Amino acid sequence: MRISLNWLRELVEIKLSPEELAHILTMAGFEVEDIEDRRTWANGVVVGRVLERQPHPNADKLSVCQVDVGASETLNIVCGAPNVRADIYVPVATVGAYLPNIDLKIKPAKLRGVPSQGMICSLKELGLPSEVDGIYIFPQENLPLGSDVRPLLGLDDVILDVTATANRADALSMVGIAREVAALTDAKLNIPEPGEVSVSGSVGKLGLKIADTQACPAYIGTVIEQVKIASSPEWLQQRLRSAGVRPISNVVDITNYVLLEWGQPLHAFDQERLKFVANADSLTIGVRFANPGETLKTLDGQTRNLTTQNLLITANDQPVALAGVMGGEETEVHEGTQSLILEAALFDSVAIRRSSRSVGLRSEASGRYERGVNRAELEIANRRALSLISELAAGVIVHQEIADTRPDPASWSRSILLRLDRVNEVLGPINVGETGELEAKDVERTLTALGCELTPAGEGTWNVSVPPYRYRDLEREIDLIEEVARLYGYDNFCDTLPDKAEAGYLPVDQELVRKLRAALRAEGLTELIHYSLVKPGEDRQIVLSNPLFAEYSALRTDLLAGLIDAFQYNLEQGNGSLNGFEIGRIFWQEEDGLQEKDAIAGIIGGDTSLGKWSKGSKEQPLAWFEAKGILESVFQQLGILVEYQPDCRDERLHPGRTASLWIGGNRLGIFGQLHPQLRRDKDLPESVYVFQLDLDVFLNALDKDEILVPTFKPYSTYPASDRDIAFFAPVKVSVSEIEKAINKAGKGLLESVEIFDEYRGENVPQGQRSLAFRLVYRASDRTLTDTEVEPVHNKVREALVEKFGVNLRS
């Protein structure tokens, strides 16, 4: 927003230079992007009067003028403007003047043989916008000749280009900036307070119909007659130009002026044009959302196709304006306007934001409504506009209608508890010659300057009543603390670091999950993420009562279904087999209520020989033990021992190639090959394996000191002693049980056990199988002798016979 210091000085006493004021505003959180010092634009330009104008003897488009600038002699000036004539007052750049906007220094010159001792200026040459082709002619008469033109043209001003943060809607007005400057500098405010307006006229000329009071909580419509449309007075035009707004006419300029002064958007309708659009003599101004298919031609000449998101102003239900965004071209004020309807309203910020975006149109009004307009100053801004229209356009107020559904004014302010201890805890010590803390009087003075009312609620505690114009951004105690820091000055607080600083760290669970992810990625698995919402229809599913889509209306009961579908989809898209894993939450119903837990699942499969290098023409699908080896490699990296037991409960998995996984007697999860029928239904490769593990059980197993902080165990440098053992064992006895018994019996010297042969068939007793194991014995401090190994090995043999009834073959 462009801030005129001349205008600002009328609202608040300013004794600072523009640069000092810009620094204070910047340190308080308002970015001053530019300081436009207009005082340098017309240095040496004075008021002159054209006494005589003669055609140039050597050029048809030039004139030779005699100009009186209050000096002892008149100046002979050659001018090329078509509107120059005798007996007018004009700005004259005298010899020696420099015009920075056109980079021109005035010197005596000869133009087509005629001497010229200066230049009669246009507004553009002085840096001001102008729609007139030619020099500027002062509308005033009897101006003092030779006087400085800068006060007459508003060039004795400095403009600050200030950007307010998004939460400071109150700072989008001159009054808001004045309040801020007063709070920062302890200056006195002089905010104009318009008086009450009198309504003199008949009743019933206007009706209001608000269809959605949430979108429009307040609307004031005022009928004004006998209006005389003309140019605005020079002071008003100068203020609009300084703010970057083009003057149009007195009524339109007044609405723009009040917008800049109070931050309240207004709109003026031509009453006769409203009646023409409504096709009726009596008018009902309405506020409603647009119907599909409606259109509106806005003031910028564009025809807008409206949607149900557009909030409209209507005349007898005919669209005449985009509420809070832009008026309609059919009802705009023009030179022949004699009666008005002035709109002053409050619109919901969300409704205006949606309406503005849906048509791709933003305006000064919509920008303010989107941030939030002060609902307590609607009547003030309306009275200000009405008094100016009465004064500058001779308007007579004949009728006013008000629709107001705002809550009680007492609710326009909120009360927040503020603690002095909390203020000092958050902000820290201040520099007051020596390190100290903010005192109660400092907090009270700062917040009172902002317009807050403080009521003591105990020692070092206040109930702070926030003014209505700060209602939207001062909501919590921390907001008030920020205001104290901002106004007291961030640079007045000590910049010392806290005495103690602890390095951040991840919780153990998060650290372990990261290690788990890294281990799975190291095995070539890609992490996948799927929606938690799935199709309904499974047992024990939790179904949502208000789903966004019917096909995503239930919570997933496991992760495997999503992984299998992803594997199938990648094959269909020609991307090959997808080896991946997912960590996520699953949900299900029990008799005692709803349950949820974290799980980790994965899918592995396809032909491992596929790639850029040919390994033969025959497919080499992944074997069960190869897939199991990938999982075991992950377990080995994490330092945990997992047991496998046969399992056939999941119908999606092969009943003979599925195992449940156990850790320390707790069920960890399941691993197995997809059922052949499911594989055929989904057209998947021959060998696809999946696993799903309970993440909580997994993390509990990992949460041990020897795993979290592994210690190095030196390798033995002594040779090993190998022994093979073969026997017939019942088929019902698993290899894992046998290995467990061998490890227990050989504990101390036994380093490893590995099965290397299994045989079923001829010469093997019914119901048994032949198994062969290799046992490796080793000591860390010596070379083992046969006399040391044999007793331990015999103990292993005896344990197998005693526990499983095996028939030893070696």
UniProtKB/Swiss-Prot annotation:
Q: Which GO terms describe its cellular component?
A: phenylalanine-tRNA ligase complex
Enzyme superclass (EC) = ligase
The UniProt entry, under Pfam families, shows:
B3_4 (PF03483), B5 (PF03484), FDX-ACB (PF03147), tRNA_bind (PF01588), tRNA_synthFbeta (PF17759)
Alphabetically, which GO biological process terms does the record hold? phenylalanyl-tRNA aminoacylation
Principal localization reads: cytoplasm
Q: Which GO terms describe its molecular function?
A: ATP binding; magnesium ion binding; phenylalanine-tRNA ligase activity; tRNA binding
Which locations, inside or outside the cell, does it occupy?
Cytoplasm
* Cofactor(s), names only, from the UniProt record: Mg(2+)
Query: Which PROSITE patterns does this chain map to?
Result: B5, FDX_ACB, TRBD
- Catalytic activity line of the entry: tRNA(Phe) + L-phenylalanine + ATP = L-phenylalanyl-tRNA(Phe) + AMP + diphosphate + H(+)
Q: Which residues form the signal peptide?
A: none
Q: How does it assemble?
A: Tetramer of two alpha and two beta subunits.
Q: Which NCBIfam families would you find in this protein's record?
A: pheT_bact (TIGR00472), YtpR (NF045760)
Which family does this protein fall into? Belongs to the phenylalanyl-tRNA synthetase beta subunit family. Type 1 subfamily.
Please report the name of this protein according to its UniProt entry.
Phenylalanine--tRNA ligase beta subunit
Q: Tell me the organism.
A: Nostoc sp. (strain PCC 7120 / SAG 25.82 / UTEX 2576)
